[in-house]
Curated annotation (Swiss-Prot):
This is L-2,4-diaminobutyric acid acetyltransferase. It comes from the Bacteria. PANTHER family: N-ACETYLTRANSFERASE, UPF0039 PROTEIN C11D3.02C. The gene is ectA. It is an enzyme of class 2 (transferase). Belongs to the acetyltransferase family. EctA subfamily.
Amino acid sequence: MYFKMITSAPWVLYPEIGEDPSKKWIFREPKISDGDGIYSLIADCPPLDMNSSYCNFLQSTHFSKTSILVEHKGDIAGFISGYQKPDEQDVLFIWQVAVSPRFRGNGLAFRMLKELLEREALSEVKSVETTITEDNQASWALFKKLDAMNGNHGQVSTFLDEKAHFKGKHDTEFLYRIPLK
């Protein structure tokens, strides 16, 4: 004895099967309506320092050309905030890199960084700078990868010292400067 079984085609039950992978992630400039979502994302990404939500609204408006957001099916999956240094416009300073725990393991941080650096508005950027605490292994790996892609000419120095600047309330921030090819 056998039973007839009627099932839908796999692409009907699981529409993501036929989904174009390039449409899975949307990389774009942040906008004012993203401010609260960015604030929530940063809160979900310790050890990143929390700023006020007002700061995240400023990042998504005043610094939208030098920041990038990636979304997946309407959810904010990641965000990089950055700015061009006022006295060195050819230097892009990366302030924070955040990827939602739900979306880690997809290479989003590096993809966001590459997408950001490929923008026409940043075509004059010759170096990337960021600060990283000693224990933030994810950030070290990300920026070492960027450095390797650009010839391994990056330099690391102490920027803000735990004792001299933070009076023991925050770990030392190391400045990583990466010249771009």
